[in-house]
């Protein structure tokens, strides 16, 4: 599953609902998610450590914040890239990074872009390759 969303609506009628206790199942899922991000960050950090290129992190959103707070080596990261004009020239909440347009990559053959945008990865990668690095 991609995401879980809840919609709550106030109802004046009182109906007693008993929810199934899913604590143990949810605890396992949460532990798996933490391990997933830990492993992903270790993998990305190995690339960051050995690259001489300028490093950029794509996406001024929770995906990037998760990587950063899971131990991403941010010393070589120049800035956060995002297509959203409303996010550009602002700081990514909870970080020191300013958000810039991916167009700063034009004519930069010495860049490594970390892309961790879930189901949007293919679309973003295609846009960078076809419209920025052409």
Describe the predicted segments one by one.
Residues 3-134:
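Hydrophobic, well-ordered beta-alpha structural blocks that scaffold small-molecule cofactor pockets
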């Amino acid at each position: 599953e991609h995401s879980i969303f809840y919609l709550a609506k106030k109802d004046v009628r009182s109906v007693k609902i008993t929810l199934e206790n899913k604590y143990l199942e949810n605890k396992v899922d949460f532990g798996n998610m933490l391990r997933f991000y830990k492993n992903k960050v270790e993998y990305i950090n190995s690339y960051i450590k050995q690259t001489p290129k300028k490093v950029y992190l794509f996406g001024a959103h929770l995906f990037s914040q998760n990587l950063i707070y899971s131990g991403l080596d941010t010393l070589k990261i120049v800035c956060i890239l995002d297509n959203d004009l409303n996010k550009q020239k602002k700081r990514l909440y909870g970080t020191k990074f300013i958000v810039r347009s991916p167009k700063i990559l034009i004519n930069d053959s010495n860049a490594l872009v970390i892309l961790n945008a879930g189901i949007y990865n293919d679309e973003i990668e295609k846009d960078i390759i076809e419209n920025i690095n052409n």
